[in-house]
Amino acid sequence: MRIKICGITRVEDVLFAEKAGADAIGVVMYSPTSRRSVPDAKAREIFSALGPFVTRVVVTHTESESDLEKILAIRPDAIQISHPFVFEKYPGVRVLRVIGRGDAVPTDCDAVIVDESMGAGKAFDQEFAKVVAKTSRVPVILAGGLTPENVGLAIREIRPHAVDVASGVETEPGIKDHTKIAAFIRAAREADHGT
């Protein structure tokens, strides 16, 4: 089970998330409607603060080649995009595609993220998530409405490869609550290990 803490906007939050056991960190870039979107310099600062064993993910809604070049310049391990945006694969950069109910499960990616709300923190469709988890040929990441209180049940019911949280561990958009991060990671690990 892997755990991604997404929508990081502050170095102190990324340092805490890494120490608490997060496997991946997400920063939002070139997404002007998101209150979690950060400029290039801030994304670089956040990623630079991480040790070598945490996966760095850029979440974006851009379709601009120029923006993508700037994103690639900060050297993310993966880029998370909404399906069906056509995205050329770049060597060494994994592609995570976000899908919702009714979307076909894409195969032109390294993993799919089941998120009905496309990052708005609304609960995922459990039946759709179960079908995707059982039929996908790539790893499935569960997102949308997850909190420290419900992540354990979601993991036990759906058995995703990973879980992804943003608003479920925040005090306000982009400001993480360290107590909630620790509780989320603990609950996810306990559910994964059957405790």
From Swiss-Prot:
Q: Name one GO molecular function term.
A: phosphoribosylanthranilate isomerase activity
Q: Does the keyword Amino-acid biosynthesis belong to this entry? A: yes
Question: Which top-level group of life is the source organism from?
Answer: Archaea
- Broadest EC class assigned to this enzyme: isomerase
Q: Please write the reaction equations for the catalytic activity of this protein.
A: N-(5-phospho-beta-D-ribosyl)anthranilate = 1-(2-carboxyphenylamino)-1-deoxy-D-ribulose 5-phosphate
Q: What is its EC number?
A: 5.3.1.24
Q: In which pathway does it act?
A: Amino-acid biosynthesis; L-tryptophan biosynthesis; L-tryptophan from chorismate: step 3/5
Q: Which UniProt keywords apply?
A: Amino-acid biosynthesis, Aromatic amino acid biosynthesis, Isomerase, Tryptophan biosynthesis
CDD domains per the UniProt record, alphabetical: PRAI (cd00405)
Gene Ontology biological process terms, A to Z: L-tryptophan biosynthetic process
Alphabetical list of PANTHER family matching this protein: N-(5'-PHOSPHORIBOSYL)ANTHRANILATE ISOMERASE
Q: Which family does it belong to?
A: Belongs to the TrpF family.
- Record's protein name: N-(5'-phosphoribosyl)anthranilate isomerase
Species: Methanoregula boonei (strain DSM 21154 / JCM 14090 / 6A8)
